[in-house]
């Protein structure tokens, strides 16, 4: 590298490193929305397979009484409720509402609270 190129390269702005970056609610919820979407695809596939097997063998149906399976089903319910609520939030964004920083933060927390409440409503 020539001396001029080296000087230009050294003066370029650098991006903040991840260790000093504070995650925001919007970025965290965006990543969580993608993760729940992928997880729901696989979990629904497994649930359909499990339901088909339980039709032919009652032992698979007895698995639903296991505590670990119940915890997994509650986690699945939360992921589904979260993905639903955040999808509704995205629909409002698609029509042009809620793009201010304040609105994004408020609706983000509303999505988290509503998904918890919906999950509790499903299991109580």
Swiss-Prot record:
Residues that hold heme according to the record: 83
Needed co-factor(s): heme
InterPro entries reported in the protein's UniProt record: SQR/QFR_C/D (IPR034804), Succ_DH_cyt_bsu_CS (IPR018495), Succ_DH_cytb556 (IPR014314), SuccDH_FuR_B_TM-su (IPR000701)
Alphabetic keyword roster: Cell inner membrane, Cell membrane, Electron transport, Heme, Iron, Membrane, Metal-binding, Transmembrane, Transmembrane helix, Transport, Tricarboxylic acid cycle
Protein's membrane topology: Multi-pass membrane protein
Cellular component, GO annotation: plasma membrane
Function as written in the Swiss-Prot or TrEMBL entry: Membrane-anchoring subunit of succinate dehydrogenase (SDH).
Subunit and partners: Part of an enzyme complex containing four subunits: a flavoprotein, an iron-sulfur protein, plus two membrane-anchoring proteins, SdhC and SdhD. The complex can form homotrimers.
Family indicated by similarity: Belongs to the cytochrome b560 family.
Name under which the protein is recorded: Succinate dehydrogenase cytochrome b556 subunit
């Amino acid at each position: 590298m020539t001396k001029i190129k080296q000087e230009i390269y050294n003066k370029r702005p650098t991006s903040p490193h991840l260790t000093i970056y504070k995650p925001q609610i919007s970025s965290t919820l965006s990543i969580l929305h993608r993760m729940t979407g992928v997880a729901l695809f696989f979990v629904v596939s497994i649930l359909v397979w499990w339901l088909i097997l339980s039709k032919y063998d009652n032992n698979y149906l007895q698995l639903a009484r296991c505590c670990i399976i119940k915890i997994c089903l509650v986690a699945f319910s939360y992921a589904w409720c979260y993905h639903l609520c955040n999808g509704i939030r995205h629909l409002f964004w698609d029509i042009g509402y809620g793009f201010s920083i304040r609105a994004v933060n408020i609706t983000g927390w509303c999505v988290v609270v509503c998904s918890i409440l919906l999950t509790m409503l499903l299991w109580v």
